[in-house]
């Protein structure tokens, strides 16, 4: 994968709670004026789809299945698709760590 540490570093994690359907923009398909309670009340952890799209654009990636948009323009995230970029990022960090250790060993530190 071309997505690794640079891409992961460009992502901003957020915490949020779902809004009640009545609080959504009335143009969105999930809007329902009669539903005043959120379906999920637990604190959620994740990304903002628009920011993921920007990070993908910044890395010239057009075929990452971790970001989607439906026919109505609603953007979404598929979190399981972030596993491979995360593995790549760990591999890149491991290689950097190995190189730094070698430099320290060579310097007798």
Report each predicted region and the residues it spans.
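Stable alpha-helical elements in mature extracytoplasmic
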Residues: 1-7, 48, 86
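Acidic, glycine-rich loop-and-strand cores that form catalytic or ligand-binding grooves
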Residues: 3-39
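Glycine-rich, acidic and aromatic/proline-enriched surface loops and short helix-turn segments
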Residues: 10-13, 49-62
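Poly-acidic low-complexity segments
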Residues: 19, 48, 77-78
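Short linear sequence elements within intrinsically disordered, low-complexity coil regions
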Residues: 21-23, 50, 84-87
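Short, conserved beta-strand/beta-arch hydrophobic-aromatic motifs that form part
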Residues: 44-46
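C-terminal intramolecular chaperone/auto-processing assembly modules
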Residues: 58, 62-109
